[in-house]
């Protein structure tokens, strides 16, 4: 019997063993996921083949990016099926065509800005686009900043600084936008999502979250958002209930409408998560979840040996919407 998650209008069936990889291939950590206009699923991962493409049924189509990326982190796709690949290993954002051709690079590979300088980039994490095509970059691990660029990569402005007050950040981990131009920032270690206008003016914050890591706008007017939350990051509360890892669905004002998983901590079983790090939605409303279960294993499970399946394909899950 398939495992289901969620409630009401937000119920999902767990599709086990969805990704059909070529023999001998592994995904390792899946940092982020995106879906194009043809419902092809792009899986940005930290294995030997950084970008692997599947169809909706999980059949392998192709791979690219070998030798290009330092460390996969964020992935965003625009209305023209261009992919914005954020690499926190070499401190760049690359705009790529669906065949992997690099169309634009923002940042200088392997030349990070000084730590917490506010200058772009020091381990940037994700991108989002304004309705006009302007590029927002969350930055990230070595900065506490959001940068705004023209569509051709010229810096317009930046905002944010370390801290916990409105407009301050403690690991700017993900970023999203809606059709009205509002900017939503996953402020991970402050346990919140902050909302800004397109010029960085603070508007609101969403609380009652636990280490929000993935952030996806579902589109349309007054959209819902899917938030991937990490579990506890400290050994002292490892295994505590009701802290994730999980997915939370909220409305356009941040009010929770559904929660998927996370009641009893992380796990390999169907219906459980390891470390949701990237989320995408296809045209049928199905959810694809990329997880960093390899990197996060020791944080979640201590000295328990990591099963080989975690590094093969367990860090990618599909949740099929029940209509």
Residue ranges and their predicted role:
Residues 1-323:
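Eukaryotic scaffold repeat domains enriched in small/polar residues
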